[in-house]
From Swiss-Prot:
EC number: 1.1.1.-
Organism: Streptomyces niveus
PANTHER family in alphabetical order: DTDP-4-DEHYDRORHAMNOSE REDUCTASE, METHIONINE ADENOSYLTRANSFERASE 2 SUBUNIT BETA
Descriptive protein name: dTDP-4-keto-6-deoxy-D-glucose reductase
InterPro entries per record: dTDP_dehydrorham_reduct, NAD(P)-bd_dom_sf, RmlD-like-bd
Keyword check for Translocase: no
Residue(s) at site: Could provide a fine-tuning to achieve optimal pKa matching between active site and substrate: 103
Enzyme class per UniProt: oxidoreductase
GO-annotated cellular components: cytosol
Domain of life: Bacteria
Pathway(s) per entry: Antibiotic biosynthesis; novobiocin biosynthesis
Biological classification of the source: Bacteria, Bacillati, Actinomycetota, Actinomycetes, Kitasatosporales
Length: 288
């Protein structure tokens, strides 16, 4: 049976690439933006689902504004926790597969090795707590048909991100200060979109980490961006997190392990440097 996809958050960086990929594969897909649907509204969620009758929903919708989540956690929780619960509930009632996007920030960052998919979550900030609530709702309501894909440090063509910010700052400043004590995995939205499609086609469920292989600091990522621009990476200066507003609330080490992909018979996402080298001409063209 052909999958019928419904993608929420379809105007976002990942959502746009996922919808474009599915259309390129001639897969039936409905792109839903926040203007089309409030995922916290139960009646609206069920009406949209019943109108389009998808077999798979990918929830890319989220409250991602980190600082605003700290200032108003209840509003972020309504979307990241409550919205996920509403989608999971309708998927349970209609026998629909749900892929829910989550974050590395569900972890506290105290580990010194990549977090396994089964590692205990312990967020240290409001954003992480609200995303943890969404994960739990999906796993509680859809133990067999729910899939959590945690991702991190996303970049892509559609919307502002760290790479595009560095491209602009290289043109505006002689030097750029970048945090060098937070570790993660830069991940191209195109790679993640391909991984989500492979996951659904394979019929796998559970928790997966949708991040690139390898690890880096923001400082490492900024230096590589400068190198790809043909600029001097020495213009990037390392600074500690406590020099950045809100830095104390961000976990230091949230590198994610990828064993679940291999156990499901799937290949994890490639190394972040390989992906960025391929993606960069596309990103830079948009800034020219």
């Amino acid at each position: 049976m052909t999958d019928r996809w419904l993608v929420t958050g379809a105007a976002g960086m990942l959502g746009r690439d996922l919808v474009a990929l599915l259309r390129g594969l001639n897969e039936p897909v409905v792109a839903i933006t926040r203007h089309d649907l409030d995922i916290t509204d139960r009646l609206s969620v069920r009406a949209v689902v019943d109108r389009h009758r998808p077999t798979t929903i990918v929830n890319c919708a989220a409250w991602t504004r980190f600082g605003e989540a700290e200032a108003g956690e209840s509003a972020a929780l309504l979307v990241n926790g409550g919205g996920a619960r509403e989608l999971a509930a309708v998927c349970r009632d209609r026998s629909i597969r749900l892929v829910h996007l989550s974050t590395d920030y569900v972890f506290d960052g105290t580990s010194r090795r990549p977090y396994a998919e089964s590692a205990v979550t312990s967020p240290i900030n409001a954003y992480g707590r609200t995303k943890q609530a969404g994960e739990q709702a999906v796993l509680d309501l859809l133990p067999d048909d729910g899939t959590i894909v945690r991702t991190a440090w996303l970049y892509g063509r559609h919307g502002m991100n760290f790479i595009r910010k560095m491209v602009r700052l290289e043109q505006l400043r002689e030097t750029v200060d970048v945090v060098d004590d937070q570790w993660g995995q830069p991940t191209w939205t195109v790679d993640l979109a391909q991984q989500i499609v492979a996951l659904v086609r394979h019929g796998a469920s559970g928790v997966f980490h949708g991040t690139s292989a390898g690890e880096a600091t923001w400082y490492d990522l900024a230096r590589m961006t400068f190198r790809l621009l043909g600029a001097d990476p020495g213009r990037v200066r390392p600074v500690p997190s406590d020099r950045i507003a809100g830095g104390e609330l961000r976990p230091r080490y949230t590198v994610l392990g990828h064993d679940a992909w291999r156990e499901a018979g799937l290949t994890p996402i490639r190394h972040w440097t390989t992906a960025l080298t391929q993606a960069f001409p596309l990103l830079n063209a948009d800034e020219s």
